[in-house]
């Protein structure tokens, strides 16, 4: 039997007790199930209040039945919703009644999967449903809603259309050599290619912000021993997460703390103090710290503002320069302002990094500057009309598309190889297609939808 033609059923509301609970059905038996359970033929898109009965006519519950005939439904199939009381026992009895009339229990995400397979939404929109449900902040929810409404997909579709136009031009020139089109002399190909690369870069940047809002930003606190790193972690966490002493090298290993700032998730990593040491255990801690720095979304480089070397903090640890991300991802924290007498402030430096002067010992003003700065790094200041949600797999696909475009451009400019450019353009289009599901393996679809809630 084709499983897509089976009628599926699941409880669509959250587990636990509540005022209302919903059982959702999708498939060819939806109308028949409505008749058998309610005792009446349901008018499409009308609310029918009445009893829900078992196979012997006994009342299981009372509530509202709604029938949506396909293709004008969420899944594109006939859909029935039974809205009753939100007790788990009542809902389970109602679900078992649906199984009695011929339904099977739905797999996690199967309703959204059917909507995707029936072209009611694309893969990015389907994933946005889960992102909206799991959103941990109002900004993340707004971004997920915009993706659900198709904003991310429209951006990807626009890039795909531009790639198709470029492929047509390039492949036509290859297939009809008598036209003698010189790709480089013509200039049209490079112009179109650079325009696509520019727009792709913009989408990558916005998708990166969307992924941070969804998954949380990894913030690594780094610096010399006794710079106040652990004190800063404790202030951000709002509790004594790390041991703080005056003994240099107290923190010898990675310490992770998951926190929220106004609902926005951050994964804060405290690290061992960066210094040369003969202590084997501490040396391992320093190596782990440098590794964490290289993997961070944001690095907080903490310096003791009372130390003589604080005037040139990036010279404190030469290996830090090799491990740190883009300078724009480094925030310099000049700590212990209460001792140095420096003014609490935030400054934007010429090389792209931000400097915040504060005291990690109860300086509310400086700590609020840091919190606001971290929210800004995650895209908190986006307007309701900008941004969209994205996942790591989307970022990987965008990166692959960008790499193919870069490689294709190099093949064209260095070797004049139009055939190789055409292949890179095809690969870039394929990578973008994986975002919306235009090109997706069954294994990928299975992994994505299996992570959804049952009933979604």
Swiss-Prot record:
Its main location: cytoplasm. One of its GO terms (cellular component) is cytosol. It is found in: Cytoplasm. Its EC number is 3.6.-.-. GTP binds at residues 226-231, 245-251, 270-273, 335-338. It comes from the Bacteria. One of its GO terms (biological process) is tRNA methylation. Binds 1 potassium ion per subunit. GO terms for molecular function: GTP binding; GTPase activity; metal ion binding. Homodimer. Heterotetramer of two MnmE and two MnmG subunits. HAMAP family: GTPase_MnmE. This is tRNA modification GTPase MnmE. It comes from Pseudomonas putida (strain ATCC 47054 / DSM 6125 / CFBP 8728 / NCIMB 11950 / KT2440).
């Amino acid at each position: 039997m084709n499983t897509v033609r089976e009628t599926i059923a699941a409880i669509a509301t959250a587990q636990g007790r509540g005022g209302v609970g919903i059982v959702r059905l999708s498939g060819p038996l939806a109308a028949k199930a409505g008749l058998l359970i309610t005792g009446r033929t349901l008018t499409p898109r009308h609310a029918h209040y009445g009893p829900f009965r078992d196979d012997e006519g006994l009342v299981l519950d009372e509530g509202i039945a709604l029938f949506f005939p396909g293709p004008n439904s969420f899944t594109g199939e006939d859909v029935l919703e039974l809205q009753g009381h939100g007790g788990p026992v009542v809902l389970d009895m109602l679900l078992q009644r649906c199984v009695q009339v011929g339904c099977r229990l739905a797999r996690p995400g199967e309703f959204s999967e059917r909507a995707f397979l029936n072209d009611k939404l694309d893969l990015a929109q389907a994933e946005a449903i889960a992102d909206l449900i799991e959103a941990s902040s109002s900004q993340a929810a707004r971004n997920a809603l915009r993706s659900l409404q198709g904003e991310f997909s429209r951006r990807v579709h626009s890039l795909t259309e531009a790639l198709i136009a470029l492929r047509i031009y390039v492949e036509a020139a290859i297939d009809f050599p008598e036209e003698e089109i010189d790709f480089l002399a013509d200039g049209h190909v490079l112009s179109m290619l650079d325009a696509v690369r520019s727009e792709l870069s913009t989408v990558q940047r916005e998708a990166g912000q969307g992924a941070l809002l969804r998954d949380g930003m990894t913030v690594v606190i780094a610096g010399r021993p006794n710079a106040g790193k652990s004190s800063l972690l404790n202030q951000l966490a709002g509790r004594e997460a790390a041991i703080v002493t005056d003994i240099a090298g107290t923190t010898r290993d990675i310490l992770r703390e998951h926190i929220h700032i106004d609902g926005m998730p951050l994964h804060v990593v405290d690290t061992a103090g960066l210094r040369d040491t003969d202590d084997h255990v501490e040396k391992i801690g320093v190596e782990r710290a440098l590794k964490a720095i290289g993997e961070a979304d944001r690095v907080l480089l903490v310096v003791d503002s009372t130390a003589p070397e604080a005037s040139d903090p990036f010279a404190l640890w030469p290996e830090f320069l090799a491990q740190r991300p883009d300078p724009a991802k480094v925030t310099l924290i000049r700590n212990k302002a209460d001792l140095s007498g420096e003014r609490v402030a935030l400054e934007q430096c010429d090389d792209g990094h931000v400097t915040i002067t504060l005291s990690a010992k109860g300086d509310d003003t400086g700590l609020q500057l840091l919190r606001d700065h971290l929210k800004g790094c995650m895209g908190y200041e986006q307007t309701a009309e900008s941004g969209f949600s994205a996942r790591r797999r989307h970022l990987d696909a965008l990166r692959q598309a960008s790499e193919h475009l870069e490689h294709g451009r190099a093949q064209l400019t260095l070797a004049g190889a139009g055939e190789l450019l055409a292949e890179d353009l095809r690969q870039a289009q394929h990578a973008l297609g994986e975002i919306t599901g235009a090109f997706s393996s069954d294994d990928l679809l299975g992994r994505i939808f299996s992570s959804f809630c049952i009933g979604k």
